């Protein structure tokens, strides 16, 4: 990733922070996007300690508008002049609840953060990404066999819809410099997963850092092998 500029959403989260660290170690200039500045600053310090200088961009996807994403793309262009990759790690899940008992706002939030916000951000970044010789738009996705079951609500619905968005975007970009791909990691020990499984009963989950290298692969030229597909990666518990 030497010389590349990569935007990571949900950068303060489990996979987002691990992927940001790995992308930075691989030579990328990393833009850390998240809604909690204090956590982003801690991650900034970790990256700076390994000799790189990331950028922080606090933004809450829940309330961000298309204009906010356009402003982000304009700032990236003005300050860095390029954008070679976007890694969509940001996600929102409030727990397993029957639909009829779920707050309507929670349903809307699950659909928005996990689908609409990703579409809006991609839409804003694509013009700048098309100027690169090779760029990657990567969606981190959940396992449909799991989230297609009862009680997953707006989050589960958004996961299904993202596959359609990915396929549509791939069809639009297949002959250009922007590669679109998905990454479906195995179970990870994250705050999101903890809302569905207790630690005591969760024997499958692994450290999100186990999937950081897969993120780098998809962002790098080697990711062309996965163009238009969802790469299902599995890491066995240790």
Give residue spans per PLM region.
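Catalytic loop of short-chain dehydrogenase/reductase
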Residues: 92, 130, 134-175, 187
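Conserved mid-core segment of classical short-chain dehydrogenase/reductases
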Residues: 62-70, 74, 91-108, 151
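Conserved glycine-rich Rossmann-like NAD(P)H-binding loop of the short-chain dehydrogenase/reductase
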Residues: 28-43
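C-terminal helical subdomain
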Residues: 175-178, 182-183, 190, 198-238
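Catalytic Tyr-X3-Lys loop
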Residues: 84, 100-119, 138, 162
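Amphipathic alpha-helical dimer-interface segment in Rossmann-like NAD(P)H-dependent oxidoreductases
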Residues: 113-133, 171
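Rossmann-fold cofactor-recognition segment
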Residues: 49-65
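Conserved glycine-rich cofactor-binding loop
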Residues: 12-13
């Amino acid at each position: 990733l030497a010389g590349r500029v990569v935007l990571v959403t949900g950068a303060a989260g489990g996979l987002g922070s691990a992927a940001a660290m790995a992308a930075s170690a691989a030579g990328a200039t990393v833009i850390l996007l998240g809604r909690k500045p204090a956590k982003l600053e801690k991650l900034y310090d970790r990256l700076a300690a390994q000799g790189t200088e990331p950028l922080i961009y606090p933004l809450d996807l829940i309330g961000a508008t298309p204009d906010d994403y356009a402003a982000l793309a304009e700032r990236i262009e003005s300050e860095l002049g390029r954008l070679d990759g976007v890694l969509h790690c940001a996600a929102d899940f409030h727990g397993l609840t029957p639909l009829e008992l779920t707050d309507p706002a929670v349903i809307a939030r699950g659909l928005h953060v996990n689908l609409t916000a990703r579409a809006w951000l991609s839409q804003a970044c694509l013009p700048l990404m098309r100027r690169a010789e090779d760029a990657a738009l990567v969606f981190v996705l959940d396992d449909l066999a799991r989230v297609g079951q009862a009680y997953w609500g707006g989050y589960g619905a958004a996961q299904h819809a993202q596959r359609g968005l990915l396929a549509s975007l791939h069809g639009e970009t297949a002959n250009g410099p922007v590669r679109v791909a998905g990454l479906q990691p195995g179970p990870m020990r994250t705050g999101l997963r903890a809302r569905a499984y207790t630690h005591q009963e969760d024997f499958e989950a692994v450290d999100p850092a186990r999937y950081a290298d897969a993120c780098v692969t998809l962002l790098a030229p080697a990711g062309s092998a996965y163009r238009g597909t969802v790469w299902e990666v599995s890491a066995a518990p240790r």
